[in-house]
Amino acid sequence: MSDKAAGEVKNGNGATAEPSLNILAQYVKDLSFESPGAPLSLRPREKAPSININVNVNANPLSETDFDVVLTLEAKAVDGKDVLFNTELVYGGVFRIQGIPQEHMLPLLFIECPRLLFPFARQIIADATRNGGYPPLMIDPIDFAQMFQQRMAEEQAKSAVKS
């Protein structure tokens, strides 16, 4: 009988690698804020504007253990047909992931990594809207697990159609 745990991962010298996730860097790749109607759009309003938020996550390998995970947040505030502001943030992180079985890599990259990046990206968006003359936009927490499941279902449906 073997004493080895199922799914055990070995490092290059044959020793068992301890599972680890480290953030090597975080960075703003792109940040834009537009307020096309300013200063008129800054006046007090009787009702809150409609705010649409889009979120996207991408991950790319940099090496065998390092991955670039990019969180894109787009927010647009509209009052009737007037665009009050439009902001976009592309925020990335370089993650070193070791000792994780391959079958757990996608959930780690598309759920846990963006979950770690989100509070920083949220603060940048809040600061940008506040500095633009509006109340800070505090984006609600995002369910990255649900986003990942939806993404996997869409990819599965696409591959089923191609078959």
From Swiss-Prot:
Top-level taxon in the UniProt lineage: Bacteria
Annotated protein name in UniProt: Protein-export protein SecB
One annotated GO biological process: protein tetramerization
Chief location of this protein within or outside the cell: cytoplasm
Positions in coiled-coil regions: none
Protein family membership: Belongs to the SecB family.
Provenance organism: Brucella anthropi (strain ATCC 49188 / DSM 6882 / CCUG 24695 / JCM 21032 / LMG 3331 / NBRC 15819 / NCTC 12168 / Alc 37)
Annotated keywords: Chaperone, Cytoplasm, Protein transport, Translocation, Transport
Subunit structure: Homotetramer, a dimer of dimers. One homotetramer interacts with 1 SecA dimer.
Cellular component, GO, one term: cytoplasm
Protein task: One of the proteins required for the normal export of preproteins out of the cell cytoplasm. It is a molecular chaperone that binds to a subset of precursor proteins, maintaining them in a translocation-competent state. It also specifically binds to its receptor SecA.
NCBIfam families tied to this protein: PRK05751.1-3, secB
Record has Signal as a keyword: no
MF-aspect GO terms: unfolded protein binding
Intrachain S-S bonds: none
Location in or out of the cell: Cytoplasm
